[in-house]
């Protein structure tokens, strides 16, 4: 028996039919760098790199630029002839636009005869007596009578049209006042010289403007160079730029030459002064800068005149006079003239801020003495009646004994060779009286001793009674006792 095999094909029921994907065009096979442009049909490169394939039906565009003389690098299809000219798509488009513009220019506009023929159909005919042929002949006759020449006119192109000055209409108002021989073409010698002078002045101003422009460009490039050098200096460090250890031998030599060239271009001494004067004269000669320089110079000089000669001193800030002639300015309030003396007047200006009545240093009045010494007090009467035995003799006043340290500030030390001034803390003006009393006692010791001998025993009783009264002035006097011996107190 023959066996029948039945193959059951799987069904697509319940399955999603996949959408066929459109085949993406392959990218260019340029090897030097990845190119994402699609390939040309049947080729391995895009239109930009198709010249890499020597077998491709393309060659370089035949267009050559008139500015720099370079040939277009784009690809163009090979012509049928071997030496034929072929252009790329861009230059084909440009040639088509240029040809279209040229055809527009060469194609003349509608002629006058054609326009009249087109308008003749709108003309009114009298009772239909005129025919189109008669109207055509009438239009031709009018054109023939009004034509400029008997011959046939050629179409007028753009190059044949009159090119006038666009500002001629604006200048037509003043045309009556102008010279009627302005366009005659014949000039006198004076007119030629005047015209040439105006042209030279104009040319000079143009050259000056160009020079200023070049100066501006130089300053701008120098500023950029200094800025870049500063950034590089901050990034790399000073040792790599100026230090000899961070430079090569050739770089050191170049740096040395640059420094020598910089010193060579500098001017010194008289040459520098002459160069500055030359720059000032050039500034005065230029238009615009002359007025500014003149204004700056005149504002810096004093306006006063001495013997019909202007003062050459520099004026003070915000004023027009120098320090010597500032009082001539009636509006200023900062200076006054010195009053001087009755014999010799003085007009030297002095600032008001120093005093209400300012004076120059020659006539300045010194202020009164602020320090006044104190007056010596008179000797009171109750001290004269004191006991005589309380005073010291001349022998006792001799400095035979060493004084304590509290009196050392008031004495002269012979051994040290220097003098110590009295201490201001020990100064007491009330002790001047006691100082005079001690001096009087030291100068006249004999009288004191005589009075003591003449006094009897009876006087001693009286002196003992008065001793209690004299205790008070004794405490104020310049005498003190220490260890039973009288010692003088500190006297300043």
From Swiss-Prot:
GO BP terms: chromatin organization
Keyword Phosphoprotein: yes
Subcellular locations according to the entry: Nucleus; Mitochondrion
UniProt entry keywords in alphabetical sequence: Chromatin regulator, Isopeptide bond, Mitochondrion, Nucleus, Phosphoprotein, Ubl conjugation
An annotated GO cellular component: NSL complex
Phosphothreonine found at: 131
Residue ranges, compositional bias (Acidic residues): 167-178
Compositional bias annotation for Basic and acidic residues: 135-144
Pfam families the record matches: zf-C3Hc3H
Region (Required for interaction with other NSL complex members): 308-364
InterPro entries found in the cross-reference section: NSL2 (IPR026316), Potential_DNA-bd (IPR025927)
Region described as Disordered: 127-182, 455-492
Cross-link (Glycyl lysine isopeptide (Lys-Gly) (interchain with G-Cter in SUMO2)): 78
Phosphoserine: residues bearing it: 147, 149, 168, 172, 175
Subunit and interaction comment: Component of the NSL complex at least composed of KAT8/MOF, KANSL1, KANSL2, KANSL3, MCRS1, PHF20, OGT1/OGT, WDR5 and HCFC1.
Function according to Swiss-Prot or TrEMBL: Non-catalytic component of the NSL histone acetyltransferase complex, a multiprotein complex that mediates histone H4 acetylation at 'Lys-5'- and 'Lys-8' (H4K5ac and H4K8ac) at transcription start sites and promotes transcription initiation. Required for NSL complex stability and for transcription of intraciliary transport genes in both ciliated and non-ciliated cells by regulating histone H4 acetylation at 'Lys-5'- and 'Lys-12' (H4K5ac and H4K12ac). This is necessary for cilium assembly in ciliated cells and for organization of the microtubule cytoskeleton in non-ciliated cells.
Protein name listed in UniProt: KAT8 regulatory NSL complex subunit 2
């Amino acid at each position: 028996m023959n066996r029948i095999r039945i193959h059951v094909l799987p069904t697509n029921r319940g399955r999603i039919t996949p959408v066929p994907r459109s085949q993406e065009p392959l990218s260019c096979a340029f090897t030097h760098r990845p190119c994402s442009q699609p390939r040309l049909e049947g080729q391995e490169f895009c239109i930009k790199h198709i010249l890499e394939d020597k077998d491709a039906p393309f060659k370089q565009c035949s267009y050559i630029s008139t500015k720099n003389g370079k040939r277009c690098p784009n690809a163009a299809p090979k012509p049928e002839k071997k030496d034929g000219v072929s252009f790329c798509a861009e230059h084909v488009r440009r040639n088509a636009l240029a040809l279209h513009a040229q055809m527009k220019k060469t194609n003349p506009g509608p002629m006058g005869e054609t326009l009249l023929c087109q308008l003749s159909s709108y003309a009114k005919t009298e009772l239909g007596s005129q025919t189109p042929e008669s109207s055509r002949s009438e239009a031709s006759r009018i054109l023939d009578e009004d034509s400029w020449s008997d011959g046939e006119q050629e179409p007028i192109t753009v190059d044949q049209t009159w090119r006038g000055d666009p500002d001629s209409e604006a200048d037509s108002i003043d045309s009556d006042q102008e010279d009627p021989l302005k366009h005659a073409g014949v000039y006198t010698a004076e007119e030629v010289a005047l015209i040439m002078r105006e042209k030279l002045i104009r040319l000079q101003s143009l050259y000056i403007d160009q020079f200023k422009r070049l100066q501006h460009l130089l300053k701008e490039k120098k500023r950029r160079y200094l800025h870049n050098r500063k950034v590089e200096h901050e990034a790399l460090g000073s040792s790599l730029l100026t230090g000899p250890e961070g430079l090569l031998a050739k770089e050191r030599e170049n740096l040395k030459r640059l420094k020598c060239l910089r010193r060579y271009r500098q001017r010194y001494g008289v040459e520098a002064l002459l160069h500055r004067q030359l720059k000032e004269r050039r500034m005065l000669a230029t238009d615009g800068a002359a007025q500014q320089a003149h204004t700056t110079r005149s504002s810096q000089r004093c306006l006063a005149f001495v013997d019909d000669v202007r003062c050459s001193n520099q004026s003070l800030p915000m004023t027009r006079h120098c320090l010597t002639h500032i009082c001539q300015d009636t509006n200023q309030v900062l200076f006054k003239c010195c009053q001087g003396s009755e014999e010799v007047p003085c007009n030297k200006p002095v600032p008001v801020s120093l005093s209400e009545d300012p004076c120059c240093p020659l006539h300045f009045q010194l202020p009164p003495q602020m320090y006044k010494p104190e007056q010596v007090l008179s000797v009171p009467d109750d001290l004269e009646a004191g006991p005589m035995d309380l005073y010291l003799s001349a022998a006792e006043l001799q400095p035979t004994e060493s004084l304590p340290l509290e009196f050392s500030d008031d004495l002269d030390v012979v051994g040290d060779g220097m003098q110590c001034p009295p201490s201001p803390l020990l100064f007491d003006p009330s002790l001047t009286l006691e100082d005079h009393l001690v001096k009087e006692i030291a100068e006249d010791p004999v009288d004191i001793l005589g009075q003591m001998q003449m006094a009897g025993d009876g006087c001693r009783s009286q002196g003992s009674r008065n001793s209690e009264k004299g205790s008070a002035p004794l405490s104020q006097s310049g005498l003190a006792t220490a260890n039973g011996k009288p010692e003088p107190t500190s006297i300043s």
